[in-house]
Amino acid sequence: NGDIYIFYLENRPVGYISLYRREESIEVREFFGISRGVVESMYAFIKTYREYYSELIIKAPVKSKLNFYIHNQVAMKKNESPFIMGRITNVESMLKRLHLKGSNLKISVIDKIIEENNGVFEIDINGNISKKDKIENDMEIDVSELNQLLFGYFSMNEMIELERVKINNTEKISELEKLFVKKKVYIQEYQ
């Protein structure tokens, strides 16, 4: 029962909003514009609903900067609450799907729930993945932290700084940094 509005500039789509109307509020679940001007125009559009709804809720990724486009910061309340949860159920399969070519790495994964995920995963220069039991590794990581790396929630540098990963071969840090980069996470889960 929601609405999707697509915004155009010179017959090209430049942004969209997905919103749901409730009794007293309007909830924006997806909000994307390609430039500052587009985002400001979209906010102006949403403000027209203020006449009919007492509350406007905009859901955005945790590290989103959307709130800085709102001119009246005093009238705004920002709550950050991550509402997405992911779980790697098969580490070897997940690594194979990523096509990690160009590096020779040995990543030790620790999973306290799924025993099959424990081990050292060797990635060769061609992107082939093989699981080894007990060999020296370049990096040790818990499966939950690996999940955050793979989805781009944290960069490799941030994981090292936060001590969420153990680096056993410092010569491999630059390779790891190239493989695991921070990205915007656009996965949305609705309750």
Locations of regions flagged by a protein language model:
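Intrinsically disordered, low-complexity, positively biased terminal segments
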Residues: 1-191
